[in-house]
Amino acid sequence: MANTGGRIPLWLVATVAGLAAIGVLGIFFYGGYSGLGSSI
């Protein structure tokens, strides 16, 4: 992870990872709120 000369910028990786985490949490909480996530 110390190599900053990689092909993928670190900010891009962090942005994608953040959006993915928010999306997964959003779907999980939405499913639990609507009663569909109780089976997960």
From Swiss-Prot:
InterPro entries: PSII_PsbJ, PSII_PsbJ_sf
UniProt subcellular location: Plastid, Cyanelle thylakoid membrane
One term under GO cellular component: photosystem II reaction center
Segments passing through the bilayer: 8-28
A biological-process GO annotation: photosynthesis
Highest taxon above the source species: Eukaryota
Keyword terms, alphabetized: Cyanelle, Membrane, Photosynthesis, Photosystem II, Plastid, Reaction center, Thylakoid, Transmembrane, Transmembrane helix
Membrane topology: Single-pass membrane protein
SUPFAM superfamilies: Photosystem II reaction center protein J, PsbJ
Gene3D superfamilies: 6.10.250.2070
Record-stated family: Belongs to the PsbJ family.
Assembly, per entry: PSII is composed of 1 copy each of membrane proteins PsbA, PsbB, PsbC, PsbD, PsbE, PsbF, PsbH, PsbI, PsbJ, PsbK, PsbL, PsbM, PsbT, PsbX, PsbY, PsbZ, Psb30/Ycf12, at least 3 peripheral proteins of the oxygen-evolving complex and a large number of cofactors. It forms dimeric complexes.
Role: One of the components of the core complex of photosystem II (PSII). PSII is a light-driven water:plastoquinone oxidoreductase that uses light energy to abstract electrons from H(2)O, generating O(2) and a proton gradient subsequently used for ATP formation. It consists of a core antenna complex that captures photons, and an electron transfer chain that converts photonic excitation into a charge separation.
Protein name: Photosystem II reaction center protein J
The species this protein was found in: Cyanophora paradoxa
Encoding gene (name): psbJ
